Amino acid sequence: MLLGSVPQLDRVAVQLGPFPVYWYGIIIGTGVLLGLWLATREGERLGIPKDTFVDLVLIAVPIAILFARMYYVIFEWEYYVQNPSQIINIRQGGLAIHGGLIGAVITGILFAKRRGVSFWKLADIAAPSILLGQAIGRWGNFMNQEAHGDEVTRQFLEGLHLPDFIINQMYIDGVYYHPTFLYESLWNFAGVILLLALRKVNLRRGELFFTYLIWYSIGRFFVEGLRTDSLMLGPLRIAQVMSIGLVVISIIFIIVRRKMGQADKRYSEN
């Protein structure tokens, strides 16, 4: 597709009759499947049957998407109260990761209790998978030309040595923008590598998941400061507030669980 003289990628991957299939959904789905593959491999190594994570994903993903959308709609209520028909339209984005995390954690706790397994063990195994899914999912924002930063020049983007297809996709309505999706995606990919390495350190149970929350939140805090489409509560960027909260809560949980003897088991213990 051409916008002016700048070639760009079409957000629609394929048209099935009257129904467009968007790259956003394909990319999100790919992230889920690769994350599931990573979790099932590690789960089997630690004695958790493959179908445990398959069942968890089948339940948690729809609920996480629902919570992600609800979270987004709540903080954009002025728009959606005037356009209620758009509340269920997620084909072009509008999913908030923090809302999805809330839904996923609630589902994971209830699922673990019902299956009689440790939630912290499931969370630790799933942590790299969740971050991998987030790293891949940001490319859905890229295809939708959303979640970008402030205005920049083409020369600035070329100075980052980015490939032309990224630079061109950051040209929106006659202006080039910061590719904040890319910054966060690269940060998340680096986090996946870190979490996979920390598996070998054999941390106390639950601490790999808290490390994920801390790592992701630090990156998200700084990237969010560059974005132009942040969900706001008065003068505050909600994602930055949530990021600070998650870092503080994670550190407190690590310290308190150790002092209370609730983190005696190690990552690889049954």
UniProtKB/Swiss-Prot annotation:
Biological or metabolic pathway of the protein: Protein modification; lipoprotein biosynthesis (diacylglyceryl transfer)
Name of the top EC class for this enzyme: transferase
Residue intervals passing through the bilayer: 19-39, 56-76, 92-112, 116-136, 178-198, 206-226, 236-256
Residues annotated for a 1,2-diacyl-sn-glycero-3-phospho-(1'-sn-glycerol) binding in this entry: 138
Entry's EC annotation: 2.5.1.145
Membrane topology qualifier: Multi-pass membrane protein
Claim: Ligase is one of the keywords in the record: no
Top-level lineage group: Bacteria
Location(s), subcellular: Cell membrane
One example of a Gene Ontology biological process annotation: lipoprotein biosynthetic process
InterPro entries for the chain: Lgt
Gene Ontology terms: cellular component: plasma membrane
GO MF, one example: phosphatidylglycerol-prolipoprotein diacylglyceryl transferase activity
Keyword field: Cell membrane, Membrane, Transferase, Transmembrane, Transmembrane helix
Cited function: Catalyzes the transfer of the diacylglyceryl group from phosphatidylglycerol to the sulfhydryl group of the N-terminal cysteine of a prolipoprotein, the first step in the formation of mature lipoproteins.
Similarity annotation: Belongs to the Lgt family.
Protein name, per record: Phosphatidylglycerol--prolipoprotein diacylglyceryl transferase
Lineage: Bacteria, Bacillati, Bacillota, Bacilli, Bacillales
